[in-house]
Amino acid sequence: MKYLVYDSTFEGFLTAVFAVFEYRYNEVTIVARHRFAPLLFGEEETVYTDANKAQRVLTKIEQCWGKEGVAIVLRAFLSEETHMEDYLLEAIRLMVKYPEGKVLENFAHRAIASIRKAAKSVEREVHRMKEFVRFEKIGELYFAKIVPEYDVLPLVVPHFKTRFSDQQWVLYDPERGYGFIYNLHEVLPFTPADKHFGALTPATADAYQTLWKTYFQHINIAERKNAKYQMRNMPKRYWQYLPEV
């Protein structure tokens, strides 16, 4: 068995799918780096994310399944369900084999059923987050801490950017250790150095304003490229496929 280990990004996963077809792998499984355990048996291969290869896979999916199909794949991926990468690979293999077939409608197939169930769950979680997330206003800053069941933070950010376009805000997921900052100009992903960030609400507005000035406003270009939070950042070009964003 060959194990394709990727960087946990959606583009990394699509690159791994590309590799499966490029090298005609049969006995293969795709696994995120943070979930991969050293093997006694089997062959490990690191997949290096390639945006061009990822786009080719995405284009093929859209050609066969349309934007709705891409949305289903995206949502299922963000579910973080165990073995979801392999379910998606299985579905894509069926798509290539039966390009005119309604593969995603075959709910009797275990992989398809798992994908559709996960995608639906993620979609519901996105709507739930939009409805129930509440920002706390501290000084000039709005702050919200959320722990969604699925990794939906990138999918709800556009909603809050539109809703609070005239306010500075922070949306943070302490369970996954990353968040997004809106500074009135752009939305930026961030990963705090302190693993306990957001665990306690500062007692005063002044304390939080100090945090804003000393931490958030000094994020530089190098930090924006930090691989840890890029793992969680859904590129904006994928938002077009998701009605909820």
Predicted stretch roles:
Residues 1-51:
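N-terminal ordered "arm"
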Residues 165-237:
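A recognition module on extended beta-rich or small alphabeta surfaces enriched in W/G with H and D/E
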Residues 101-192:
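Internal, well-folded beta-alpha domain core
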Residues 12-23, 89-94, 155-162, 209-217:
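Short, hydrophobic/amphipathic alpha-helical patches that form generic packing surfaces
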Residues 1-3, 142, 194-197:
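Glycine- and acidic
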Residues 31-127:
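Charged, alpha-helical interface segments at or near domain boundaries
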Residues 27, 67-70, 124, 128, ...:
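Intrinsically disordered or highly flexible coil/loop and linker segments, enriched in small
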